[in-house]
Amino acid sequence: MSTARTAAARPLVVSADEELLDDLLRLLAAAGTEPELATGGPALRRAHRDASLVLLGSDALTGGVLRALPRRPGVVVVSGRPLPPIGWAAAVEVGAERVAVLPEDEAWLLSRSAAAAKI
């Protein structure tokens, strides 16, 4: 497998929530993958385009930076608590295929992350 292919297969994590980041990094390590972290600018646009899976922390939904990104498959919003209605609306707006609430959805997210790592 080439380096370019390996880099493209990395999941993207977008969040500034340190507790959520710790949980996601642990979970992604268990899935056998190392994510790319980005919060804005050209790095976010490139990583969003190339990532095998995009994990958006619920904290990232409130910023306008995600609105400029094109919709794509493989976007999951991740939160440490159930989302309020405005959070669900924002998840729909960014085209999320699912909202995963940790720790309840950890097994599903682990499976989804492992599957994306094989792409």
Where are these regions (language model features)?
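A short, hydrophobic beta-strand element within the central beta-sheet of small alpha/beta folds
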Residues: 73-83
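A short, well-structured beta->alpha microelement
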Residues: 2, 23-52, 56-63
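The C-terminal output helix
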Residues: 115-119
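Alpha4 helix (beta4-alpha4-beta5 surface) of REC/receiver domains from two-component response regulators
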Residues: 82-98
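C-terminal output helix
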Residues: 104-113
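Short amphipathic alpha-helix used as the core "switch/output" element in two-component signaling
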Residues: 61-72
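Non-catalytic signal-transmission and effector/linker regions of two-component phosphorelay proteins
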Residues: 1-10
